[in-house]
């Protein structure tokens, strides 16, 4: 079968297009691979630099604490050979008098300033210490709350449930904070707890409520009118004087009890 010129041209263009497209895809993959490799190398270099910086930081801290700026070793004393010569000469000069006077004794160095520590650098050259090199404060800052570990160590066991139940008005506070001094805590412990005593200890809670025990015959009409005139205020405002001077309510099946304030602790908590 003989292909026509048009078919041959079409197949050639089709194959060339896909070949060129494949070459472009391969080139893009190769470029992305090179980019990732370069990025990995750069990250490794940065990691090595960070590790070196972390390794050198303790040395810098030691240098700054010794008095020299970090990163720079204390310079050697200048003209060391020149300084050694007079020292040896001076020692040779003093050999003969020591031999005449008695046994050899350790001779003090005549020039102690030669071996003295280097002077601390000026303030504008010194670098402030790192945050972790600051000395720990002996006393905690009173304006800030303690951390979790200190709070756990300072916390006291909770009080027994029975002791909480005996609290009359929910004023139980047994918290000794570290911010209070020992004197204040001792004074608070010496003071007795306040006693809340309900009134009318000789009577029960039902003594203030005058409920009808048994049905009684209704009062006549004039008595009803007088009783209505006496108690026109359905919700009277009770005071101490009224409580002392007011007579107890009359019992009767026809009248609802008037609410009287109860003193002391109620059952509703």
Swiss-Prot record:
Might you report a single GO cellular component term? synapse
- Give the UniProt subcellular location, in the record's own words: Cell membrane; Postsynaptic cell membrane; Postsynaptic density membrane; Cytoplasm, Perinuclear region
Q: How does it sit in the membrane?
A: Single-pass type III membrane protein
Instruction: Give positions of region: Required for apoptosis induction.
Output: 146-269
Write the record's keywords in alphabetical order, separated by commas. Answer: Adaptive immunity, Cell membrane, Cell projection, Cytoplasm, Immunity, Lipoprotein, Membrane, Nucleus, Palmitate, Phosphoprotein, Postsynaptic cell membrane, Signal-anchor, Synapse, Transmembrane, Transmembrane helix
Describe, from its UniProt entry, the tissues in which this protein is expressed: Expressed in brain. Expressed in the cerebral cortex and especially in hippocampal neural cells (at protein level).
GO annotation, biological process: adaptive immune response; alpha-beta T cell differentiation; positive regulation of apoptotic process; postsynapse to nucleus signaling pathway; regulation of transcription by RNA polymerase I; T cell differentiation in thymus
How is this protein named in the record?
Proline-rich protein 7
């Amino acid at each position: 079968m003989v292909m026509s010129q048009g078919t041959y041209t079409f197949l050639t263009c089709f194959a060339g297009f896909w070949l060129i497209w494949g070459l472009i895809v391969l080139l893009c993959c190769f470029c992305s691979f090179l980019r990732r490799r370069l990025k990995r190398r750069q990250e490794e270099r940065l990691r090595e630099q960070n590790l070196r910086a972390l390794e050198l930081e303790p040395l810098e801290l030691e240098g700054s604490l010794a008095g020299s700026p970090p990163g720079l070793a204390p310079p050697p004393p200048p003209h060391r050979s020149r300084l050694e010569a007079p020292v040896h000469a001076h020692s040779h000069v003093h050999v003969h008098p020591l031999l005449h006077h008695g046994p050899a004794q350790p001779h003090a160095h005549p020039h102690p300033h030669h071996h003295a520590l280097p002077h601390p650098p000026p303030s504008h050259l010194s670098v402030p210490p790192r945050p972790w090199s600051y000395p720990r404060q002996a006393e905690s800052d009173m304006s800030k709350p303690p951390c979790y570990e200190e709070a756990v160590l300072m916390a006291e066991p909770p009080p027994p449930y029975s002791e909480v139940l005996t609290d009359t008005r929910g004023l139980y506070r047994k918290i000794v904070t570290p911010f209070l001094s020992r004197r204040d805590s001792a004074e608070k412990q010496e003071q007795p707890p306040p006693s809340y005593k309900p009134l009318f200890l000789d009577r029960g809670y039902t003594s203030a409520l005058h409920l009808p025990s048994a049905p009684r015959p209704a009062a006549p009409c004039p008595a009803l009118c007088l009783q209505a005139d006496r108690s026109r205020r359905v919700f009277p405002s009770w005071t101490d004087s009224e409580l002392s001077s007011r007579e107890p309510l009359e019992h009767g099946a026809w009248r609802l009890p008037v609410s009287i304030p109860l003193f002391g602790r109620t059952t509703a908590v």
